[in-house]
């Protein structure tokens, strides 16, 4: 959806939405337009210039309409770049590297997105100022990913020689740092290297 897609008629729709109507459901098209505008502006103008007013103009809605959905710019950006239901290991082939290499590549490719690379430095500052935003991010995105990794290990009949949360953090930290520093350059080779490191810390589960 382009940033200008909700101008004109949509402004009228937004004005109607602004009117207080008890029980009226929120229009998901407006939510999508706001999130898309946020991602576009992060790439074009950077974190600091991506203001609520700029987002509203790009999305073709009013600033109050944005604030009714998200209490702050940081909350909106955090949700736009780190939505719920993020990545999980997929097919269990019996070969851990074969399973984990595409998973690592998926994470690295995702984190290398220009909008995310633009947002992360600003969000890290916001997390220090507003710890509740950090906790919200962990609950929505990070902890579900960690749990899905644990579930994958259990299904594959493997256990970690170190605590599995530490192993996941090492894996994600390596991918996160690479994405910020290098983007997607050499992503496939790096993802395979990380998968090999993770595999080296695994062993068959006793009794599996």
How would you label these PLM feature ranges?
Residues 49, 72-77, 87-88, 100:
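Short amphipathic alpha-helical segment with a characteristic S/N-K-E followed by hydrophobic residues
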Residues 1-45, 49-58, 64:
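Basic, helix-initiating cap at the start of DNA-binding domains
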Residues 75-81, 111-139:
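Amphipathic alpha-helical segments used for helix-helix packing
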Residues 88-117, 168:
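Hydrophobic alpha-helical connector segments
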Residues 124, 150, 159-181, 189-201:
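Hydrophobic alpha-helical segments that form the core
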Residues 118, 131-158, 165:
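Amphipathic alpha-helical packing segments from all-alpha helical-bundle domains
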């Amino acid at each position: 959806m382009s940033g200008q897609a909700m101008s004109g008629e949509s402004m009228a729709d937004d004005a109607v939405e602004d009117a207080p109507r008890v029980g009226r459901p929120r229009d998901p098209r407006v939510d999508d337009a706001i999130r898309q505008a946020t991602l576009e502006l992060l790439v074009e103008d950077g974190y600091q210039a991506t203001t609520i007013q700029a987002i509203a103009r790009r999305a073709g809605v009013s600033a109050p309409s944005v604030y009714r959905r998200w209490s702050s710019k940081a909350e909106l950006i955090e949700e736009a770049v780190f939505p719920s239901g993020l990545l999980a290991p997929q097919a269990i082939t019996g070969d851990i590297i074969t399973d984990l290499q595409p998973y690592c590549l998926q994470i690295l490719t995702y984190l290398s997105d220009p909008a995310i690379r633009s947002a992360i430095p600003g969000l890290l500052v916001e997390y220090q100022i507003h710890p509740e935003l950090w906790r919200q991010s962990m609950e929505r995105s990070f902890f579900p990913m960690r749990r899905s990794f644990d579930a994958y290990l259990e299904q594959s009949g493997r256990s970690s020689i170190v605590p599995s949360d530490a192993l996941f953090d090492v894996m994600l930290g390596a991918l996160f740092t690479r994405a910020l520093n290098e983007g997607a350059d050499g992503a496939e080779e790096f993802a395979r290297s990380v998968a090999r490191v993770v595999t080296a810390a695994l062993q068959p589960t006793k009794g599996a």
